[in-house]
Amino acid sequence: TIKVCVSECGNNKKYKFDQSAYTNMSDVGTSYGIVYPGASGDANKATIQYHTPELPFATTVAVAFSTTSADGSSGNAGGTTANGDSMNEYSLTSAPIDGLTLHAQVYDFNAYADGVTTNDQSEEGGGYAATYALGNATVGYGKSFKAPAILEGVRSAGATTVEYYENTGMSIGYAVNDDLSVSYTQETSEPNYMTSATVGYDVEMDSIQLAYSLGGATLSIARADVENVGYVQNTDLTETIIAMSFAF
C-alpha cells in the first residue's frame, strides 16, 4: 500500500507500551517537558509511505520519506533553512505469538545544506516496545531515543548541550470486569550531555488511572505525579484529569 499524507499517517512507537485505562498523561494536559523522537506523521511534514502486505508472524513493515511543508519547500518566498530538511523512516509491527506484540521505529534526518551552517550531529531517533496480554491483564515495556540536531558551532558548549535523550516506559492495565479497568504507568526520560561530567536530572512520571462504564457513558479518572519537569531539579507537579465520555 502506498500512502501520501500531510501531518498524519504517523508511525511513531513512543507510546506503544502504554496500557493506560484513559490516556497517555505525558501527551495531554500540562507539558512535562519530555523530549520524544519525531515521526513521519508529525505536523507540517508531507510524507510518502510504502506499507507491506502482512508478512509471516503478522508482521508489517513501513518505509517513509518525509519533508517539511513550509515555504522553504515550495515556490514561494523562502522560509527558514530547516524547511529543506527531509527524513527517512522505517517501522515494524509484529505479533509472533498469541498475546505478544512488538513495535519498532527508526528515523534519521537529511539536513538541508544552506552553505552557512554545519551540523555536527543531524537529528535521528526511534523507539521499540513490547506488549503481552494474558487473561485480563496486559503489560507493556518500551524505550525511545532522540538525538537532536547539533550545530558545529555549539559543540564547544558540551556542558549544556544534550547529545541524546533516552526514554523508558512501563505500564500494566487490568480489566477488573466488563465495566471497570485500572492501570499503572511509569515513564522516565534521561538527558545525556555531550560532556559526561554534566549532572542531568531525569523527568519521572507515575500515573494511576481507572475507567468505569456506565452504560452509554464512561467515567475516567487519571492522576500523574511528575518530578523534575523539563529536566529541572525539584520542579515537580501533580495533575488530575476527570473525564466523562458519551456514546450516542
Q: In which residue ranges do the predicted regions lie?
A:
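Outer-membrane beta-barrel proteins
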Residues: T1-F248
